[in-house]
Amino acid sequence: MRHVLTSEAVTRGHPDKLCDQVADGVLDALLTEDPEARAACEAAVWENHLLLFGEISARQEPDYEAVAREVLRDIGYDRPGLGLDADHCDIQIRFHPQSPDIAQGVSHRSAEDTGAGDQGIMTGYACRETPELMPLPVTLAGALVKRLDHMRRSGGMPWLLPDGKAQVSVAYEDGHPARITTVVLSAQHTPNVRTDALREVLRREVILPVLPPALTDEEPLLYINPTGRFVLGGPAGDAGLTGRKAVSDAYGGAAHHGGGSLAGKDSTKMDRTGAYLARYLAKNVVAAGLADRCEVQLAYAIGLADPVSVSVNTFGTGMIRDETLAVWLEDHVDMRPGVVIRRFGLTRPIYRGLATYGPFGENGRGMPWERTDLRFPAQF
C-alpha cells in the first residue's frame, strides 16, 4: 500500500520559533537562579514589538528584558533593517504568580509525590526510519532548516536572512520510505539577489547534501522560494507566538499529538515532562526489537501523581500484544512527575537549545529521554 507523508520545519528566525526560544531562554534563566521555579511563559512578537506574559513563581527572578534581547540577538535579529532589532525593540513584560490552587497540587513535601501541574495527553513515537528512530520526513525537513541556518550564521551565504522553512514529502510503500517526492524550501533573503541564482545555490548547497541518494533515484520536485521573492520576513512579515510549531517539534504528523506545546513550561507541566517520558518509552520499545513502530500515549490529571491512562500502539509491527506492553510499562516504569523530573534532570537550565529545532532525535542527542536503557523481560 502506498501513501505520502509530509512534514515541515522552520529556521530559528521564524517568528513562532523565535518566540519558543525566547520563552525557553526565560525558563533557563529562572532555573539558573531557582531550580524549583514554576513557569508558564508565553511570548508574542510582531514587527518591532515583543510581549512576554504568563505565570511565574520563583524565589529569584532574572532580568527578563535582558534575557529576551540576548536571545533575539543570538538568533540574528541584531540590526534595524530586519524589522525586529534586539537592541531597540519594544519589550513588554506581563507576568503574574502561579495560581495557589495549582501550587497546592504540585508542591508536596516528598518530590516523588509531586502531582501533575495540569491535565493533558502526551504522545511519544519511535520508528526504524532513521538511526535516531525518528520519522524520516520531519528528520529531513529539520536537516534542511539546520543547514540553512548554518549557511547564514557561518557567512557562507551573506544574502540569507533569519526567516525560513522547509517541507518534505516522502512516499511510503508497505509502510517503508520508498522515495522523496517533493521538497519545498523558503529562505528569506536580501533584495539584491537574483531569484534564479538563489534557487540554484540553495539547491546545490542546502538541499542536495541533505537528501539521501537512495531515495532520490527519481528526482523529487523542488520548490525553492515558490513565490519568487522572500524579502519581507520574520516578525516584520508575520506575527509569532509560542507553541505554534508543536507538531514539527515532535514527529511531524507521523504520530498523534495531544495539543500541548513545551515552550516556556517548567517540568511540573506534563506537556513537557510527559512528552519526554512518552518518547523514552516508545524509543525503548523499538530499540529493544519489540516493534518497528511504536506510539505511547500518556494521560495525567491535575494534582495526581500517577497517569490516569497508558496506551501503546505498534501498528501491527509488535512482537507482543500492545495491551501486554502497556501493562508492563505501567507496572515497571515509575511515571510519577517527581520521579521523571529527577530521572531526566529536568530542573536544569537545558531548554533554550532544545527549543531551536525540537527535543527529539538528533536534536535531543545526549538527553536522558533519548537513552535506550530500559530493560524488558527476556520472554518478550
Tell me the role of every PLM-derived stretch.
Residues 4-11, 49-57, 122, 126-127, ...:
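Short glycine-rich or small-residue beta-strand-to-loop segments that form or flank ligand, phosphate
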Residues 1-40, 46, 372-375, 380:
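N-terminal, positively charged regions that mediate nucleic acid binding
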Residues 39-59, 302-306:
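Short, charge-patterned binding micro-sites
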Residues 12-33, 126-146, 265-289:
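Alpha-helical support elements that line or immediately flank enzyme active sites
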Residues 194-286:
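Glycine-rich anion/phosphate-binding loop at the beta-strand->alpha-helix junction
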Residues 46, 291-293, 300-380:
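Internal helix-turn-beta structural module
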Residues 8-10, 14-19, 115-130, 231-255, ...:
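Conserved phosphate/anionic-ligand binding catalytic regions in large, soluble enzymes, centered on
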Residues 6, 66, 73-232, 356, ...:
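Glycine-rich, mobile lid/loop segments that gate access to catalytic sites or pores
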